[in-house]
Regions:
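Non-transmembrane, aqueous-exposed alpha-helical and coiled segments at domain scale
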Residues: 1-317, 321-428
Length: 428
């Protein structure tokens, strides 16, 4: 193929077919992809593991399965082991006969087949299904400066922002292809200039803002640009500890889904902001001030798309993206306290907390697991979004504190305190 990109001798040889026709097509796809975004070269993928966004065996993805078979047959498998987004099904999650019929007979009919393909291509292990692959309990945590070939938006924004890795918001399949050849096109967040901020976000709230609400406000304002966030460090204790990482996990997912943010900097907190400070800010950066009134305006702007806006919720999902271990522990305590205050022993709405399989195993090893189970809350490894994609689930009045789930489905957003009141039967 004709191309303008400067390739190394090895890269050009792969493109010319030195490693077979299939590998040449993979390289050609990446070169064409890179040139669309102005990439001038291909750079090595340096992370230990990859992460794939496509984890669900939808019947409609027949072309994907055919492509996967072609890659497997040609020996064009991933040069890295990889994790993948969450599984779409879990029998522990409440669903009726008709929902299960749609899930198993019309939607995810190829799940087992597709997981078999993933294993042949390089899946880390049977538990490597989560959108929060970067958690210690999962083991796919890139180092600062690592070049990645990921595509899951909430994982990309976390890796770029909280870990200081380098990754563009790639698409599904492109993520796998970068891992197969070991190179990705260099543009966007892989470049120093692409990581500079064109927005300054000033946090002037009177209390710690809800991560999912703050992330939503930032995402809708800056869209795909890079924000430099000031004033948030006072609410995060001035350090990047586990609680701060959990907060930024949820904030980032909301910026990425309510907008298209792939990288943000938090002054005095995130690694590049600590290292480079205000030099990350572009000279012509715009300013966005977020105070209590602005967060209320954003909250009030969310549409409620339930057929009956006053319907009693039939299900609550927490964990989009998947919850961390410290979230599971803290929410156990919150639910217990709220139930006691409400005079109830168990949640009054079926409630599901979702987390990575590895995180759930760690949680089960603590005394909190039995305490949470006693409240009636269910834990699961499921992807709530994949559950909500069922047309019959869409018709259900489902509540969540995830702005990502609100954006992509019919689920209704509530703040954490509102969720607690709803699921425990407290006074409104």
């Amino acid at each position: 193929m004709d191309h303008k990109m400067k390739l190394t001798d090895e890269q050009q040889a792969i493109l010319d077919g030195s490693r077979g026709e299939t590998m040449a097509k993979v390289m050609e796809t990446l070169v064409r992809y890179g040139e669309l975004f102005g990439a001038d070269e291909m750079v090595p993928v340096t992370s230990k593991y990859n992460h794939l966004v496509t984890s669900f065996g939808l019947k409609a993805l027949a072309p994907v399965y055919a492509l996967m078979d072609q890659l497997i047959d040609a020996g064009a498998v991933s040069a890295q082991k990889f994790s993948a987004d969450p599984r779409p099904l879990d029998p522990n999650v409440p669903s009726n006969f008709l929902q299960n019929f749609v899930f198993n007979k019309f939607m995810y009919t190829k799940q087992d087949f597709y997981e078999g393909q993933l294993k042949k291509l390089g899946l880390m292990n049977d538990d490597a299904f989560t959108c929060t692959c970067y958690m210690d309990e999962v083991g796919n945590t890139p180092a600062m400066g690592d070049v990645l070939s990921w595509s899951e938006s909430s994982a990309v924004v976390y890796a770029n922002s909280v870990l200081g890795a380098r990754c563009n918001r790639n698409s599904g399949i492109i993520d796998l292809m970068g891992s197969i050849v070991g190179y990705v096109p260099s543009f966007g967040f892989l470049k120093d200039e692409g990581r500079r901020a064109s927005w300054i976000v000033e946090i002037k709230t009177t209390k710690k803002p809800e991560a999912q609400l703050l992330g939503s406000a930032i995402g809708m304002k800056v869209m795909e640009d890079v924000p430099y966030i000031r004033g948030l460090d006072r609410w995060l204790g001035g350090k990047l500890d586990d609680d701060a990482k959990t907060y930024l996990k949820d904030l980032g997912a909301a910026t990425a889904s309510n907008g298209a943010v792939g990288l943000y900097h938090v002054e005095n907190i995130t690694p590049e902001a600590v290292k480079y400070g205000e030099s990350l800010i572009k000279d012509d950066a715009r300013v966005y001030v977020i105070d209590d009134a602005e967060l209320k305006r954003v909250y009030d702007s969310y549409p409620v798309i339930w057929k009956n806006k006053d319907a009693k919720p039939k299900l609550c999902f927490m964990g989009c993206p998947h919850m961390s271990l410290n979230q599971l522990i803290s929410w156990t305590e919150k639910v217990e306290a709220a139930l006691k205050a409400a005079g109830n022993e168990r949640v009054v709405i079926p409630t599901v907390f979702t987390a990575a399989p590895g995180v759930l195993k760690a949680f089960e090893a603590t005394p909190y697991a039995a305490r949470l189970k006693k409240t009636g809350v269910i834990t699961s490894y499921i992807c709530p979004l994949m559950y909500m994609n069922n047309p019959l689930s869409t018709k259900m009045p489902v509540i969540t504190s995830s702005n990502k789930l609100r954006t992509y489905t019919s689920a209704r957003y509530y703040t954490d305190d509102e969720i607690l009141t709803e699921i425990t039967g407290g006074k409104k």
